[in-house]
Amino acid sequence: MKISFLVTYYNQARFVKQSLESILALNVPCDYEILVGDDGSTDGTVEEIKKYMTENSNIKLFVMDRDVNVTYDAVLRVSAIRLHLLENSKGSYYCILDGDDWYLTKTFVQEALHIMEQDQTLSICAFNFAWVSNDDIKIHSPSIKEGKNSAQEYLLTTYIHAAACVFRNVFDMEKIQFMKELGFFDDQNIMAAHLQDGGMYYIPKVVLAYRQTGSGIWTGMSQYEKHVLDAFEYDIFTKHAHKYEKEIRLRFFTSLKFVWSNRDRFYIELGSKKASNYISLAKKLDGLFYRIINFDKLNTKDRHCVRKILKDTLLHKFIRCVKYMFRLAGKIVKALLPYWLVDLFNKKNKPAIGQ
């Protein structure tokens, strides 16, 4: 058994010590390797990494070519690097880590491997994480129960950072090639890809410090673009985990509906360059988001199909809400009843021995 740590850097020399030493401090109960992908840094990141390579032969460095005259999409770029590292990895398990983040506990890998070796149906062992900024620490509160969870349970509502997980390496070279062609292998895309092939076990222990600089891509987006990005994510998720399309559609329905209702503002809100970039990427995926943005150019049959998908999803979402309200009402009524009445009700409904 072997585990691979896939670490990515770009001009993060000041964080190399903290991130790499947090890996080296882990209690790892098997062979391991640390595959580092650098995206053409110019601030001394590579030199910092090489200092650790002289002391530890388990660290391997992959430096990517970078044209200073080209503007790269950050997500596509880091996805390509991760997939390159994964392609060269030898571990039956792996973890990912961004260069400015770090691990907070020494035992989580040991705990995860113990659980996953006992249950081969698990594709992910997930833990909790904390957002860390210069003046604040905020612990995430995921909407998921401790223990084993199905793919459906996670995909409907939950967010756990992929770097707070241990993954079983379920990808063969054919699947890696497919993901390379897709282009997206970042955070929740990784979660979706793994949930296509297995379940998840969740342990509510904070193991990752997820650094917040205040200048992230998401932080700088308008509300309109955040909805656009979420709707675009729907197409990516369904490519990674197509058998859970219904759950994924419910997860992203609010943004899909928003973009459909406000599609006429697409170029005005985003600007010509950014809007054209989304269109170019969406065309490659050829999914629902692309059809929504181009709704007014679709033929009658395709328009009807888009409307039906949105209408059916809205109905399904309404039914789920009604069921939830009934369950909640039942709990409230039970809580308000006198204890002796609840006990009497439970006794009356308890089957006799031998039934």
Regions picked out by a protein language model, each given a short descriptive name:
Residues 182-184, 189, 196, 211-355:
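C-terminal subregions of glycosyltransferases and related glycan-biosynthesis enzymes
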Residues 23, 39-40, 99:
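Conserved short acidic donor-positioning loop in nucleotide-sugar-dependent glycosyltransferases
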Residues 94:
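Short aromatic/hydrophobic "clamp" motif used to bind/position activated sugar donors
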Residues 38-47, 66-68:
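A conserved acidic beta->alpha catalytic loop
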Residues 107-139:
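Conserved donor NDP-sugar-binding/catalytic core segment of glycosyltransferases
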Residues 66-89:
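Glycine-rich, basic loop-to-helix element that forms the pyrophosphate-binding segment
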Residues 79, 127, 144-225:
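Conserved nucleotide-sugar donor-binding catalytic segment
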Residues 21-31:
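Short, acidic, metal-binding catalytic loop of nucleotide-sugar glycosyltransferases
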